[in-house]
């Protein structure tokens, strides 16, 4: 059965009120959507007064619709001189509009036109999962959860201050008003959290009371006599309370490593008002595995929509949105949205690719299958097979991403180049990063390890079994290619990959070898020869010319990447391996948590997907460190947990004494 979303179809009756034929209901009151948003949702939750004087404020909504409640709340936040420092808005939507549909239903909202335009500009490709949108330089976030609320709300990790319940009426859309939904809202509610909804249906009020809310009626909007408001009492406790952020004596972090991982973490924390000390052994950013001139990025796809597929989809789409935002802000990333063609290996593989596309049911602007003729037309050069076309994918020089991130972070980041940290020492409520002589280079409550394999000597990471993987890319002279045969204008991958030719560049780039356990930094003739064979397979029209190339005369790039035992990155708080391995340690209870090393976090093992994980990992860490909704489903965040290998072993009794 297709896993893709069924999109909303915009309909505007003569009175201009957006209407859903699927639910036979309007998206907001016929007496004015903006006025309803102010009366029911802002007024019903005591806003803007409720957020005043707070560092952050989190609102969770059921039923995003056209986004009018979000836009009204964002506008009210902007207009409030006493506003909170950061507004986090989470909304669940089963049937989202696409960008064109939003434009149609937004046409009536002139008062919010500029904010609506910003929302549409950031609007994600409508595929299932969690999508983080960032506005106002990081001070406003919108976390869209696209899919069924009963499935997604249990995966939401946050601490909510207010709730907007705005699905279609309980009579028309009963699934969104079930006891299970209300229990999930109670799970993430802070003590004192407020709730408002336009409906006064008895079943809704009863369900909210059963979940622990204190419920009452209030004057409704327009022709509705009553609406419902509620509060979550401070004395009520659910079995698992909301996910609260740690409390730090100061908002200062040391980040070790200035590659894609470290620079992205620095930028995301800086956007939240943190001060960063960024330390690296090289003399400039991207001095390690992030140093290569160009790299491609595209998602992983599988018939079962695996954890890797879901994570890589989230990472690719978030990175693309974020880099576009940096570009608009004047921090040039150099990302080339050329698209990526992933070739089928043979006819049977082509049939399987088509089956997967049909089964997933995702939009064509995320993934499409093209036969060889259409694929050749799309990339501007002949290809031996058809394949998957990823329209949102492309390529970029990782050092450019690093420089853009640091430029965006600005003075919040103190740069310490050519500096090697020999030890990390706990001191009082923080960490000291020391050199070989014991001198304290920096001290802060938080340390983020983004220094690849070097992290192993500084932190308890034995359970992750981090290993090196050597990769070699080859620069092929343009003069060595078949004369008059076009070169692809998009990334083409299969057995290896090739990148489009940069304007005026004398070479084109092809890769890559994959050699687990190897760290040799010197280029090898045999690997250049293997890359030439890969290129001949991707571009058979150049095969004869490539056969005449002497691989011993070629140049290229060698990088050593870091991978974990299951090839997924390590992103999150570092587990306290010493405490866990102590005799008698047990996990107790179904929701038992691993002990963590206070203030120590990892952004490691990005492997060959550094571009994919960089922004997602940084946004996830920033939320874990500083608070706010996670940008991923909880189960996906757990799949990246640095302590996941220990957790798995403990559950299987392997470390029980």
Swiss-Prot record:
Superkingdom, taxonomy of origin: Bacteria
Catalysed transformations (reactions): 5-aminomethyl-2-thiouridine(34) in tRNA + S-adenosyl-L-methionine = 5-methylaminomethyl-2-thiouridine(34) in tRNA + S-adenosyl-L-homocysteine + H(+)
Residue ranges of the region described as FAD-dependent cmnm(5)s(2)U34 oxidoreductase: 256-657
Gene Ontology molecular function terms on file: flavin adenine dinucleotide binding; oxidoreductase activity, acting on the CH-NH group of donors; tRNA (5-methylaminomethyl-2-thiouridylate)(34)-methyltransferase activity
GO biological process per UniProt: methylation; tRNA wobble base modification
GO cellular component: cytoplasm
Keyword list, A-Z: Cytoplasm, FAD, Flavoprotein, Methyltransferase, Multifunctional enzyme, Oxidoreductase, S-adenosyl-L-methionine, Transferase, tRNA processing
Keyword Coiled coil appears in the UniProt entry: no
Pfam families for this protein: DAO, Methyltransf_30
Region (tRNA (mnm(5)s(2)U34)-methyltransferase) location: 1-233
Predominant localisation class: cytoplasm
UniProt-listed Enzyme Commission number(s): 2.1.1.61, 1.5.-.-
Cofactor(s) needed for function: FAD
Cellular localization per UniProt: Cytoplasm
Function: Catalyzes the last two steps in the biosynthesis of 5-methylaminomethyl-2-thiouridine (mnm(5)s(2)U) at the wobble position (U34) in tRNA. Catalyzes the FAD-dependent demodification of cmnm(5)s(2)U34 to nm(5)s(2)U34, followed by the transfer of a methyl group from S-adenosyl-L-methionine to nm(5)s(2)U34, to form mnm(5)s(2)U34.
UniProt record similarity statement: In the N-terminal section; belongs to the methyltransferase superfamily. tRNA (mnm(5)s(2)U34)-methyltransferase family.
Name of this chain's protein: tRNA 5-methylaminomethyl-2-thiouridine biosynthesis bifunctional protein MnmC
Organism: Ralstonia nicotianae (strain ATCC BAA-1114 / GMI1000)
């Amino acid at each position: 059965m297709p896993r893709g979303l069924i999109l909303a179809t915009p309909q505007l009756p003569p009175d201009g009120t957006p209407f859903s034929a699927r639910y036979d209901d309007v998206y907001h009151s016929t007496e004015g959507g903006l006025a309803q948003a102010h009366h029911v949702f802002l007024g019903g939750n005591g806003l803007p007064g409720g957020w005043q004087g707070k560092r952050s404020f989190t609102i969770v909504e059921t039923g995003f619709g056209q986004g009018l409640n979000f836009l009204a709340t964002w506008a009210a936040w902007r207009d409030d001189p006493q506003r909170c420092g950061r507004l986090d808005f989470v909304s669940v939507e089963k049937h989202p509009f696409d960008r064109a549909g939003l434009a149609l239903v937004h046409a009536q909202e002139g008062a919010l036109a500029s904010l609506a335009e910003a929302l549409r500009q950031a609007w994600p490709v409508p595929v299932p999962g969690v999508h983080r949108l960032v506005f106002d330089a990081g001070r406003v976030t919108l976390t869209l959860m696209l899919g069924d609320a009963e499935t997604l709300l249990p995966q939401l990790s946050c601490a909510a201050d207010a709730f907007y319940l705005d699905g279609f009426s309980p009579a028309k859309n009963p699934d969104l008003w079930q006891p299970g939904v209300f229990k999930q809202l109670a799970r993430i509610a802070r003590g004192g959290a407020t709730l408002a909804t336009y409906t006064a249906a008895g079943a809704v009020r009863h369900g909210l009371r059963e979940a622990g809310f204190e419920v009452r009626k209030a004057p409704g909007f327009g022709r509705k006599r009553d609406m419902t408001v509620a509060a979550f009492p401070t004395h009520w406790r659910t079995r698992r309370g909301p996910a609260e952020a740690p409390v730090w004596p100061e908002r200062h972090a040391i980040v070790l490593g200035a590659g894609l991982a470290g620079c992205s973490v620095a930028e995301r924390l800086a956007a939240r008002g943190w001060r960063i000390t960024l330390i690296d052994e090289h003399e400039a950013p991207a001095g390690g595995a992030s140093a290569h001139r160009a790299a491609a990025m595209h998602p992983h796809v599988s018939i079962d929509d695996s954890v890797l597929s879901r994570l890589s989809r989230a990472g690719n789409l978030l990175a693309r949105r974020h880099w576009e935002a940096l570009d608009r802000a004047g921090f040039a990333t150099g990302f080339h949205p050329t698209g990526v063609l992933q070739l089928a290996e043979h006819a049977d593989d082509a049939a399987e690719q088509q089956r997967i596309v049909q089964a997933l049911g995702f939009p064509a602007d995320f993934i499409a299958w093209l036969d060889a003729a259409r694929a050749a037309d799309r990339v501007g050069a002949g290809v031996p097979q058809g394949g998957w076309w990823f329209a949102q994918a492309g390529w970029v020089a990782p050092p450019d991403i690093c420089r853009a991130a640091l430029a965006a972070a600005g003075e919040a980041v103190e740069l310490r180049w050519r500096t090697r940290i020999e030890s990390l020492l706990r001191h009082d409520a923080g960490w000291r990063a020391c050199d070989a002589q014991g001198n304290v280079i920096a001290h802060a409550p938080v340390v983020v390890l983004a220094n690849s394999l070097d992290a192993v000597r500084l932190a308890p990471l034995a359970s992750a079994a981090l290993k090196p993987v050597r990769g070699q890319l080859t620069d092929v002279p343009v003069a060595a290619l078949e004369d008059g045969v076009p070169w692809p204008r998009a990334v083409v991958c299969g057995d290896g990959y090739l990148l489009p030719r940069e304007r005026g560049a004398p070479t084109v780039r092809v890769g890559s070898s994959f050699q687990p356990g190897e760290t040799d930094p010197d280029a090898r003739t045999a690997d250049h020869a293997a890359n030439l064979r890969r290129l001949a397979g991707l571009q058979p029209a150049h095969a004869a010319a490539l056969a005449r190339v002497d691989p011993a005369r070629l140049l290229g790039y060698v990088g050593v990447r870091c991978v974990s035992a299951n090839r997924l990155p390590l992103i999150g708080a570092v587990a306290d391996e010493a405490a866990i391995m102590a005799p008698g340690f047990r996990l107790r209870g179904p929701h038992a948590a691993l002990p963590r090393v206070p203030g120590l976090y990892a952004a490691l093992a990005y492997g060959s997907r550094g571009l994919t994980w960089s922004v997602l990992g940084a946004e996830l860490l920033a939320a874990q460190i500083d608070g706010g909704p996670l940008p991923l489903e909880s189960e996906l965040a757990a799949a990246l947990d640095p302590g996941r290998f220990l957790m798995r072993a403990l559950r299987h009794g392997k470390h029980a004494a």
